[in-house]
């Protein structure tokens, strides 16, 4: 089973791919993203150990949403010793699936925020 995850907006999207069958889920994560993402994945996929690869939308998008979503996805891929790939744009799902199906593994997917982060800029 391959999972495709997009946490770049307040609405999170998960696609579970098993063979040719795809199941799509979406939910409003808001401030519950970190706490609820792993639980949601477990509920929708059954056993996390059945996941054979992860594709993620790496941006651009919400700083917090991408940071939390990619942290969970990267940690899950590392702990399960499975490949992870990232992609951008409207066809990110197809691109991610293609990468996984030819055996690519980015090991760690870094977010693309679309602009420089201003996390160290002083507040006025």
Where on the chain are the PLM-derived regions?
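DPxDG-like acidic metal-binding loop motif
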Residues: 53-58, 64-84
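Oxyanion-binding and handling regions
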Residues: 1-42, 46-49, 64, 79-124
């Amino acid at each position: 089973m391959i999972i495709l995850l997009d946490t770049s907006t307040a609405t999170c999207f998960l696609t579970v791919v098993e063979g040719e069958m795809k199941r799509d889920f979406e939910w409003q994560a808001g401030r519950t993203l970190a706490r609820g993402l792993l639980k949601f994945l477990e509920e929708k996929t059954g056993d996390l150990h059945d996941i054979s690869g992860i594709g993620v939308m790496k941006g651009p998008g919400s700083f917090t949403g991408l940071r939390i979503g990619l942290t969970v996805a990267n940690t899950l891929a590392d702990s399960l010793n499975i490949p992870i790939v990232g992609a951008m744009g409207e066809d990110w799902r197809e691109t991610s699936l293609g990468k996984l199906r030819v055996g690519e593994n980015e090991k760690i997917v870094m977010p693309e925020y679309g602009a420089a982060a201003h996390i160290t800029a002083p507040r006025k």
